[in-house]
Amino acid sequence: MATASVAFKSREDHRKKLELEEARKAGLAPAEVDEDGKEINPHIPEYMSKAPWYLKSEQPSLKHQKNWKIEPEPKKIWYDRGKKIYQAEQYRKGACINCGAMTHSSKACMDRPRKIGAKYTNMNIAADEKIESFELDYDGKRDRWNGYDTSTYRHVVDRYDAKEEARKKYLKEQQLKKLEEKNNNENGDDATSDGEEDLDDLRVDEAKVDESRQMDFAKVEKRVRTTGGGSTGTVRNLRIREDTAKYLLNLDVNSAHYDPKTRSMREDPLPDADPNEKFYLGDNQYRNSGQALEFKQINIHSCEAFDKGHDMHMQAAPSQAELLYKNFKVAKEKLKTQTKDTIMEKYGNAATEGEIPMELLLGQSERQIEYDRAGRIMKGQEVIIPKSKYEEDVHANNHTSVWGSWWKDHQWGYKCCQQTIRNSYCTGSAGIEAAEASIDLMKANIARKEASKESPKKVEEKKMATWGTDIPEDLELNEEALANALKKEDLSRREEKDERKRKYNVNYTNDVTSEEMEAYRMKRVHHEDPMRNFPG
């Protein structure tokens, strides 16, 4: 079947070959064996199992189907850390100036910087490191365990063994302690009730279960109570589903909504039921209980702190945000306590049983204070002078007085130059004179403006007796000028009718005289005049 091409076969040989193949496929005859002694699957098609003629294979085999380009599995090779290859006795040209090794430069030297390098002392020449260069295949480059020393895992095993020993020792001490307490109780009271013994057995069972859970996935044998009457078995993390699903607590369609995708029911399905008898109050009960409320407060605090300019983000750095929130709460409580103590110290506490001091009740004390003629305290309580928030006796920018020595128009300033701008340069008496001159000029401008408002000038409007106005009665016209204006109006009307004769360059003024206006009125056609067509 898996042989190469052979010579011509007779019909009988060909029939026997087909029968043998059918028998091998049916399992009636043993499968063909290759040169390595491995069976060849009889169901492999002939075009796959038959070797090409140029291979000249005499025995059946499937080696021609194997990929001959596949390289053997690469070895787990890695760098020999700290391996040295050659130890020189004298400094060589091109070596490291600091240690004298040829395999690296002085910038990449990992030895301690020497006060005088090996290049100049020619002593204590460091050995050359073993530099390896090998190419890894695709899987070798991505093998995270390549080069891992398995002997280092022994430290992890030792650490876990130590923890296990400490845990067993602690449990043994606790057990001995309980036995001692039990012996002491037996000496005092010999009899114990059956119910207490059952409770002790349950506690022991639960302790065993808790102990087994801490072990690495050990088998847990726990008593299982079933609905059929009680049976025991070996189980692990088994939950008895005897409780009712939350979406079956209330079958009313208009009750609390259940989202099957997220398996959440925010509202209470039984709001009218007794709270003491309910074990489920809706998913909203978890939003304001446990660590959910604290998580919400941390989110609010981080957002407010970020708005105020602090580099704080709950999602980017949750541990930092939680730590800063704890520090903030501690500082807040400390400030609140300090404020409370200050108020108590100043005003007292009316809720206490102690008597209120007489100084607070009567507003006076028995302390004797002596004053001199000027009113200064000579003996007794000294007056505490309030400390200024500004630096005292510091004259900056050529000033001869401090800031706050001048007050005018509800503004502080410098007395030497009477400037109200802080950190300004001193201008001296010239600045004072310039400020007074500007103030005088401003006052003069204000007075002039007020005077102009009180007595405004009457502007006589010049009314023209021409366009759009009635002809005044006292208007006097020159008859000669009026005749010339009439002629000029007739000429302009003729030019309007024949625009070809109009000249390009026109020399005239736009000033309209009274005579020209009168001529325009006389010549124009009054469409609204009912007597315009009446023969005169």
From Swiss-Prot:
Report one GO cellular component. spliceosomal complex
Gene Ontology molecular function terms on file = pre-mRNA 3'-splice site binding; single-stranded RNA binding; zinc ion binding
Superkingdom per UniProt? Eukaryota
| Biased composition annotated in UniProt, kind: Basic and acidic residues | 9-25, 488-501
Q: What happens when the gene is disrupted?
A: Reduced hypocotyls elongation when grown in continuous white, red, far-red and blue light conditions associated with a depression of PIF4 peak amplitude. Increased accumulation of spliced RVE8a form, but reduced production of spliced RVE8b form. Plants lacking both SMP2 and PHYB have short hypocotyls. Reduced organ size due to lower cell number and reduced fertility. Cell proliferation is arrested precociously in organ primordia.
The GO biological-process annotations, alphabetized, read as:
mRNA splicing, via spliceosome; regulation of seedling development; response to blue light; response to far red light; response to light stimulus; response to red light; RNA splicing
Compositional bias segments (type: Acidic residues):
187-200
Q: What is its main location?
A: nucleus
List the subcellular locations. Nucleus
**Motif residue range(s): Nuclear localization signal:** 486-493
Span of zinc fingers (CCHC-type): 96-109
Keywords (A to Z) from UniProt: Metal-binding, mRNA processing, mRNA splicing, Nucleus, Phosphoprotein, Spliceosome, Zinc, Zinc-finger
| Pfam families, sorted | Slu7 (PF11708)
Q: Which PANTHER family match?
A: PRE-MRNA-SPLICING FACTOR SLU7, STEP II SPLICING FACTOR SLU7
According to its UniProt entry, what is the function of this protein?
Participates in the second catalytic step of pre-mRNA splicing, when the free hydroxyl group of exon I attacks the 3'-splice site to generate spliced mRNA and the excised lariat intron. Splicing factor acting as a negative regulator of seedling photomorphogenesis by antagonizing PHYB signaling to promote light-induced hypocotyl elongation. Prevents the accumulation of functionally spliced RVE8a form, a circadian clock regulator mediating the transcriptional activation of clock genes containing evening elements (EE), but promotes PIF4 expression to fine-tune hypocotyl elongation in the light.
Q: How does it assemble?
A: Interacts with PHYB in photobodies under red light.
Name this protein carries in UniProt: Pre-mRNA-splicing factor SLU7-B
| Gene giving rise to this polypeptide | SMP2
